[in-house]
Regions:
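Short acidic alpha-helix initiation/capping motifs at coil-to-helix transition points
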Residues: 4-5, 46-47, 91-100, 117-123
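Catalytic-loop motifs flanking and including active-site residues across diverse enzymes
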Residues: 2, 6, 48, 66-70
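Short alpha-helical scaffolding segments that buttress acidic/His motifs in well-ordered protein cores
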Residues: 30-38, 71, 117-122, 143-144
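Glycine-rich phosphate/pyrophosphate-binding beta-alpha loops
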Residues: 35-67, 125-127
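Short, amphipathic C-terminal "tail helix"
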Residues: 113-148
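Gly/Pro-rich interdomain helix-loop hinge
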Residues: 58-113
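Carboxylate- and glycine-rich phosphate/diphosphate-binding segment that chelates Mg2+/Mn2+
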Residues: 1-44, 132, 138
């Protein structure tokens, strides 16, 4: 319930927040979306996206950037039909692609770091166990390699 409430707000208000930077109502609604997301995560926990994001965060990539870059690749690699399993999956991916998200080279993260990042991610066992599908280290490495 909490995550869906947050997603609904994001669908409506994120584009306005980006294109109308002085729109206080849009910013307030995104604050609510963030709160709802936090409540959802407190109850359900996080999964493989966050597990892999920790490896990027360790290298200076901001949390939101890391999760945005990893959301679609992780879900496509691990789920058989993410469009059917995750509400609004395609729409969320399109929104992410439209955001002005920096690439990893801005943070001096290189493709050669993929193996080390995958190994580090495997240490996030609680998050990986919470994911609906197994994420072997080889798969994680491929996900990281494909970010470049």
């Amino acid at each position: 319930i909490w995550s869906m409430a947050g997603i609904e707000l994001i669908r409506e208000w994120l584009p306005k927040t980006i294109h109308e930077r002085d729109n206080d109502e849009a910013r307030q609604q995104m604050l609510f979306a963030s709160f709802f997301g936090g409540v959802a995560l407190a109850h359900a926990g996080t999964t493989a996206v966050h597990a892999l994001a920790y490896s990027l965060g360790k290298r200076g990539v901001p949390h939101g950037v890391a999760n945005s870059l990893l959301f679609e690749p992780v879900m496509r690699a691990t789920l058989k039909a993410p469009e059917e399993q995750i509400p609004y999956f395609s729409e969320l991916c399109t929104m992410i692609h439209r955001l002005p998200i920096p690439t990893l080279d801005r943070y001096d993260v290189c493709r050669k770091d993929a193996a080390a990042m995958a190994a580090e991610a495997m240490g996030q066992t609680r998050l990986l166990q919470n994911h609906p599908a197994e994420v072997p280290e080889k798969m994680a490495r491929g996900i990281f390699e494909n970010l470049f």
